[in-house]
Amino acid sequence: HSNLRRQRQMCIRDSILTDHHEMETNSTFFFQPGVKSRTHPLTSKANQDLTKKIAKYHVKNFDNNGVLYFSGERFDDFFYGKGSTFPDINGSIGILFEQASSRGHIQNSANGLLPFSKTIKNQLIAGLSSLEALVELKEELHKYQLDFFKNSKKESNNYKNEAIIFGDNTDSYRVNKMAEVLLRHEIDVYKLKENITHKKIVYSLGNSYLIPKNQKKFKLIEAIFDKRINFNDSLFYDVSAWTLPYAFDLNFDMGVTNFKLGEKLQNIKNKKYKKVVDNAYAYLI
């Protein structure tokens, strides 16, 4: 599901991507923008301004249908690993919808009886209001996306001689799995031409890769490797960090300047490992 959605966005460059969810029964309906102080610093003001403009369409349609709703509170727009925020770092507008759940056919809630049919109707209203915004704000959305990639390219030009390096000399499998994720997101990854020692860490051929910063996915690359430890707000609804190489327990650095690019990586061929004995009494790792 998430892979198909991501592949579609890579090919089509959605202007708006809506992410429909459910929350606890005694709530109403939420739509973004979220809490202002919990928006990721790499997400532009232009993105949030457009999100607010689109929100006016939800307000109008919910008011016309007598639907209770809220916005600008509780939920944040920080973690790029979720469906409503990932588009924001890829030139689109991601919008989260949260509908109070009926948890089945019908349920009593603080706001009265909540039937399943009503929850579906509310999500439909939100979807249709998004389409209405898409049509009426077409030129603004198109310009926003063009500007996003123009500005990203312009910013990446400041790093023409800089690259990110990552690797692990003890486990190429984890390194390759990280590289697979990057390739799926159309990020240019290169093999090393020679071993590189950087900040007393040796990155060896076959166990390490280089990512030139000067490429079209500069903003996404920045988000993936960003080591963020300072926050405007101490509260989070979701996840506060997304430094992907830590998930693979890899060495990495974002500021390598003395390097030679090897062959461009096209696909990953993982080593074939011997099958673990099926009927073993125990395993020693």
Task: List where the protein language model places each region.
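Intrinsic-disorder/low-complexity accessory segments
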Residues: 25, 31-69, 73-79, 83-285
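Single conserved hydrophobic/aromatic residue that forms the stacking wall/gate
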Residues: 1-12
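A general structural motif
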Residues: 14-15, 161
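Histidine-centered catalytic micro-motifs
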Residues: 15-25
